[in-house]
């Protein structure tokens, strides 16, 4: 019987059997795996809080015949503020969904793990605008995965002037002279380009007091969402809920 000891973040959980739950964990040492928490559906179970979404904890997990099973756990961070705030919860749910869909089973990435941990901590502790935070998170995520958009120079010719378009297929900003060389080049407002650069390079705490118009926020969101779809070939369902929150 193999015994695993690792820090992990709960991405989601589901019901299994009559009294158990199965959690999707992103572990620091072993990547993504599914682990059963026996009796976790009982209110007095010692595992009732062990697999709540977004919990960070140290786990002792053993490998059974068909599943991994949680044997022991010690809480590191509960992220209680996320539980109390619908906007924070929706952003955290989106973040967890992106990581879950990107990672294959048993795929390890300490850089991605630390990025997820940092992002959830920011959602929990900071005052956030959901759309601004998600745009910043998405830009940082695609960059971490190797798809950073080119924003300071034309992605085609390298010139820094007249960056008036953005192309998903070409991978970033495009100047006026090169717009016809990228079939999907779309007009890009100068303020939108500045916002994208700021969201990409600035840490989350710098986003708290930034003033961005609703039009620019939505334009940035549309650009980055389309860019992610182009390069990751994944769509995320929880993003729709965040968009609905913005319109409430």
Swiss-Prot record:
It comes from the Bacteria. GO terms for cellular component: bacterial nucleoid. GO terms for biological process: DNA recombination; double-strand break repair. The keyword DNA repair applies. The keyword DNA repair applies. Transmembrane segments: none annotated. InterPro entries: ARFGAP/RecO (IPR037278), DNA_rep/recomb_RecO_N (IPR022572), NA-bd_OB-fold (IPR012340), RecO (IPR003717), RecO_C (IPR042242). Keywords: DNA damage, DNA recombination, DNA repair. Belongs to the RecO family. Involved in DNA repair and RecF pathway recombination. PANTHER family: DNA REPAIR PROTEIN RECO. This is DNA repair protein RecO. It comes from Thermoanaerobacter sp. (strain X514). The lineage of its organism: Bacteria, Bacillati, Bacillota, Clostridia, Thermoanaerobacterales. The gene is recO.
């Amino acid at each position: 019987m193999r015994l695993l000891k690792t820090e992990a973040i709960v991405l989601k959980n589901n019901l299994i059997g009559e009294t158990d739950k199965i959690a999707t964990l992103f572990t620091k040492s072993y990547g993504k795996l599914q682990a059963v928490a026996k009796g976790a559906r009982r209110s007095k179970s010692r595992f009732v809080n062990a697999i709540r979404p977004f919990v960070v904890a140290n786990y002792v997990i053993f490998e059974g015949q068909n599943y991994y099973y949680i044997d022991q756990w010690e809480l590191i961070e509960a992220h209680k503020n996320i539980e109390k705030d619908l906007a924070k919860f929706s952003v955290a749910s989106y973040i967890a969904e992106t990581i879950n869909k990107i990672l294959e089973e048993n795929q390890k990435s300490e850089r991605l793990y630390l990025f997820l941990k940092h992002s959830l901590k920011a959602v929990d502790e900071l005052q956030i605008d959901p759309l601004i935070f998600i745009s910043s998170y998405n830009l940082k995520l695609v960059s971490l995965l190797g798809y950073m958009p080119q924003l300071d120079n034309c992605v085609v010719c390298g010139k820094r002037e007249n960056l008036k378009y953005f192309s998903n297929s070409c991978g970033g900003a495009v100047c006026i002279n090169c717009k016809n060389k990228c079939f999907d080049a779309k007009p890009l407002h100068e303020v939108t380009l500045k916002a994208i650069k700021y969201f990409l390079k600035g840490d989350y705490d710098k986003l708290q007091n930034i003033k961005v118009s609703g039009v620019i926020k939505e334009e940035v969101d549309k650009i980055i969402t389309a860019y992610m779809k182009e390069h990751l070939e994944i769509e995320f369902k929880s993003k729709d809920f965040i968009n609905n929150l913005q319109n409430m």
